[in-house]
Amino acid sequence: MVVERTASFGKLHLKGIVASVGLTAGLLVLIFPLPELESPARIQLALTLGALSFWASGVMPAPITGMLYMGLLLITNSSDPLTVFSGWTNEGGSLWLVLCAFLIASGVERSGLARRAALSICASGQVKGFQSLIAAIAVIELLFALIIPSAFARTFVILAVAKEVCKENSVSETDAAVINFACFALAVPTTLIFLTSEPALNTLVVEYSELGLSWVGWFSTIGIPNIIYLFLVTVLFIRVFKPSGKVFVDGVKSRASLEDLGRLSPKEKKMALWLSLMIAFWLLYPFMGIGIAWGTMLLTSLMFLPRIGVLDAKAFADVPVGTL
């Protein structure tokens, strides 16, 4: 009991030290003259140092620290609301896209489509353990990059399938967390492989690349190096993140479970149809004059309609509001 109290006090003491260091650094930025920085920039830097120290120490929950940071930026007039909330208000609508990605992944999981996809992957016989599972995630990321330009959307769909693979094969929480992390880590190298990817459609990227809009030119110059990059990241990930125990993917059990599922259920068919509509929009939105976030938001909203939809109010429980 004494040892536990001592350890708890030690952690609390360390949190206080880290937070104090950050706050002190912020105060020094405000007190000492920095001619290169104007007053708003100095306030922003001081608040950022304080917020980082709070995040690092865990003195407050991360979402509350974020709220405090944004509130102080606005109260001190060191920034304006459009800049502070640009993730919600800018043309790209990145945070709306993240919100929709969570809801789409929830639909894939709740409809049973994720479990069927997971069983199909396990039953193929190609995925037998931790290393082959990580390699499979890399391959799926590569294939999905061709048809789903948004890294957020494809990562969360793949994540839903990866969770089901871990659940079906009784993977430990520690190893499951590593496998889930792989879905995000291996998504990074795939963002610029194909000209259909979201960053590649950015006019500035195309302009500075001096490749025009040639699909083949883009792939040969940027795509192939990024495929090599994906391969190297996959190998590095497998080398760095070792499983805590043996991860065994039971192909025989998965095949039996897949047979028990039978044909696609009505809900799975609906979700497959909605995914097809999403993919069609993601491929065509540059020619439609509609922002990817706003079109995705519209389609995701329609997924809540009765009869034809697959989502309900409970789906919002899968959205980590604190993270947003």
Predicted regions and their residues:
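Hydrophobic transmembrane alpha-helices that form the pore/transport pathway of multi-pass ion
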Residues: 122-192, 201-211
